[in-house]
Amino acid sequence: MKKILVACGTGMSTSTMIAHKLQEFLTEQGISATTAQCCLNEIPLNCNGMDLIVTSMRTNSDYGIPTLNGAALLTGINDDALKQQIKALLTQ
């Protein structure tokens, strides 16, 4: 089972919406994954053992884990491209 950390400014509303959209997509694709949420500044404390980090905004930090900006899951703009990136990372 894959593990995904979803982070936003406060670790509440936006990350919850992204995590929900992400779970819907992963279920449709038959990819088994769990999500955890946190705020952006807590990523270093919560990223151990994660396979992917999805954030609500850009981050320049390198956590040693693939990190994607998940804003497209909220807006729907270019979300297909993001979903394909997520699928590729989780099925490699």
UniProtKB/Swiss-Prot annotation:
Residues 1-92 form the PTS EIIB type-2 domain. It comes from the Bacteria. It is an enzyme of class 2 (transferase). It is found in: Cytoplasm. GO terms for molecular function: kinase activity; protein-N(PI)-phosphohistidine-sugar phosphotransferase activity. Its EC number is 2.7.1.-. GO terms for cellular component: cytoplasm; transmembrane transporter complex. Gene3D superfamilies: 3.40.50.2300. Keywords: Cytoplasm, Kinase, Phosphotransferase system, Sugar transport, Transferase, Transport. GO terms for biological process: carbohydrate transport; phosphoenolpyruvate-dependent sugar phosphotransferase system; sorbitol transmembrane transport. InterPro entries: PTS_EIIB-like_sf, PTS_EIIB_2, PTS_EIIB_2/3. The active site is at residue 8. PROSITE patterns: PTS_EIIB_TYPE_2. It holds the Pfam family PTS_IIB. The EIIB domain is phosphorylated by phospho-EIIA on a cysteinyl or histidyl residue, depending on the transported sugar. Then, it transfers the phosphoryl group to the sugar substrate concomitantly with the sugar uptake processed by the EIIC domain. The phosphoenolpyruvate-dependent sugar phosphotransferase system (sugar PTS), a major carbohydrate active -transport system, catalyzes the phosphorylation of incoming sugar substrates concomitantly with their translocation across the cell membrane. This is Putative phosphotransferase enzyme IIB component SgcB. It comes from Escherichia coli (strain K12). The gene is sgcB.
